[in-house]
A protein has these predicted regions:
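Active-site loop of short-chain dehydrogenase/reductase
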Residues: 6, 82-84, 98, 129-143, ...
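C-terminal helical subdomain
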Residues: 181, 185, 203-245
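Conserved glycine-rich Rossmann-like NAD(P)H-binding loop of the short-chain dehydrogenase/reductase
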Residues: 30-45
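Catalytic loop of short-chain dehydrogenase/reductase
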Residues: 136-164, 170, 174-177
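Substrate-binding pocket helix/loop in short-chain dehydrogenase/reductase
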Residues: 98-99, 103-111
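Conserved NAD(P)H cofactor-binding loop of Rossmann-fold oxidoreductase domains
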Residues: 90-96
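Conserved glycine-rich cofactor-binding loop
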Residues: 12-16
Length: 246
């Protein structure tokens, strides 16, 4: 399946991995729609994409921790991208530190953005995706969602939320088998943030170096670019000298 011309909605697209994926998708002649809660961040990434491609992507404010914001974002997406082919659930709030130091507000934000908001957004976009001959729902879960991975700086709420998100992906995969929608996921380890616009994007890394956004973005695009008869349901990606499994 060629990705050129595909419309792809990406949550968390105002920074980090989501932003890197949006820029790389545009470089592949896809039509990204940027979703996120920070308007300034979205507009900055949209400007970078326009400067590289000459095409300015649409931006939609979507706070995954706020279900009203999710509903509003979907209503706008239905107008801006009725030909939506791919949803990438990349947005998620993160918190680190000891469990007893977490506030109720932090816990709620992490759980709501990673679990409730992601599930609600996906459910609301199913009717759009179902109209396409072939579509994808891809979720960036993180190794923190795997039962055998160590915490490595993540908080208890974040690990719990990612475990729930992983369960959501597995259940949705089963429910949508036989439909034109593929459900896939990726579980990256710790990532160094770098954008395709940075000089460091093309730097070769050694075995001891940590993952960069480039490594994960290329893996996501590889998964999405598979032929219609192929589904890479789940992929764990960690640096060669792993920290999560030791």
């Amino acid at each position: 399946m060629t990705l050129s011309g595909k419309t792809i909605a990406i949550t968390g697209a105002g920074r980090g991995l989501g932003a890197a994926l949006a820029i790389a998708a545009a470089d592949r002649h896809m039509k990204p729609v940027l979703l996120g809660r920070n308007e300034r961040g979205l507009l900055e990434i949209a400007g970078l994409i326009e400067a590289r491609s000459g095409r300015r992507p649409d931006c939609v404010i979507c706070d995954l921790a706020d279900l009203a914001s999710v509903a509003s974002a979907v209503a706008k997406l239905a107008i801006l991208a009725p030909d939506l082919d791919i949803l990438v659930n990349s947005g998620s709030q993160w918190t680190g530190g000891a469990f007893e130091a977490q506030t109720d507000e932090q816990i709620a934000s992490v759980i709501n953005s990673t679990v409730s908001g992601t599930i609600a957004l996906t459910r609301r976009l199913l009717p759009l995706l179902s109209t396409r001959p072939a579509a994808d729902i891809h979720t960036v879960v993180s190794m923190s969602g795997l039962p055998y991975a160590r915490m490595r700086g993540s908080s208890v709420p974040f690990v719990a939320a990612k475990a729930a998100q992983n369960g959501f992906v597995q259940a949705l995969t089963e429910e949508l088998i036989g439909s034109p929608i593929r459900v896939t996921s990726i579980h990256p380890g710790i990532i160094e943030d770098v954008l395709p616009t940075d000089d460091t994007w093309n730097e070769e890394r050694n075995a001891s170096d940590m993952l960069s956004d480039r490594n994960v973005v290329e893996a996501i695009l590889y998964i999405l670019d598979q032929p219609a008869n192929v589904a890479i349901r789940s992929l764990v990606i960690e640096r060669a000298r792993t920290e999560f499994l030791s």
